[in-house]
């Protein structure tokens, strides 16, 4: 706790909030190009092969992004749209690829939560 004379000399420092997705540069989404598409294993106690991509963004950053949903069509040089949002069991993955935009296809045969996976309405 500062004294009155300390506060007269210099005011209190404002706390600055640190962003959880710095590569987006305060934008809701960013475009990027996949440099590598691969699978990664999660932290304990989980076990899986999570699909991730290394993406070079228009902001100049190169980040690791998660590919949500079952099956994908991404490969090297695919143009993707990224949003914030980490994957809790993959260290260093702080972004999600948005399905159904640019080169990323929506999830096939998806019937529930379709808007989150870029899937069109079923034909029946």
UniProtKB/Swiss-Prot annotation:
The modification 3-methylthioaspartic acid is found at residue 89. This is Small ribosomal subunit protein uS12. The gene is rpsL. CDD domains: Ribosomal_S12. Keywords: Methylation, Ribonucleoprotein, Ribosomal protein, RNA-binding, rRNA-binding, tRNA-binding. Residues 1-28, 104-124 are annotated as: Disordered. With S4 and S5 plays an important role in translational accuracy. Interacts with and stabilizes bases of the 16S rRNA that are involved in tRNA selection in the A site and with the mRNA backbone. Located at the interface of the 30S and 50S subunits, it traverses the body of the 30S subunit contacting proteins on the other side and probably holding the rRNA structure together. The combined cluster of proteins S8, S12 and S17 appears to hold together the shoulder and platform of the 30S subunit. Belongs to the universal ribosomal protein uS12 family. GO terms for molecular function: rRNA binding; structural constituent of ribosome; tRNA binding. GO terms for cellular component: small ribosomal subunit. The keyword Ribonucleoprotein applies.
């Amino acid at each position: 706790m500062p004294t009155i004379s300390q506060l007269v000399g210099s005011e209190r420092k404002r706390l600055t909030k640190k962003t959880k997705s710095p590569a987006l540069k305060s934008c809701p989404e960013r475009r990027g190009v996949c440099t590598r598409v691969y699978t990664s294993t999660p932290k304990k106690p989980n076990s899986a092969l999570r699909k991730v991509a290394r993406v070079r963004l228009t902001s100049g950053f190169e980040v690791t992004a998660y590919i949500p949903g079952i099956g994908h069509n991404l490969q090297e040089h695919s143009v993707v749209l990224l949003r914030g949002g980490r994957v809790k069991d993959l260290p260093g993955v702080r972004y999600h690829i948005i399905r159904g935009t640019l080169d990323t296809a929506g999830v096939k045969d998806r019937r529930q939560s379709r808007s989150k996976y870029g899937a069109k309405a079923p034909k029946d």
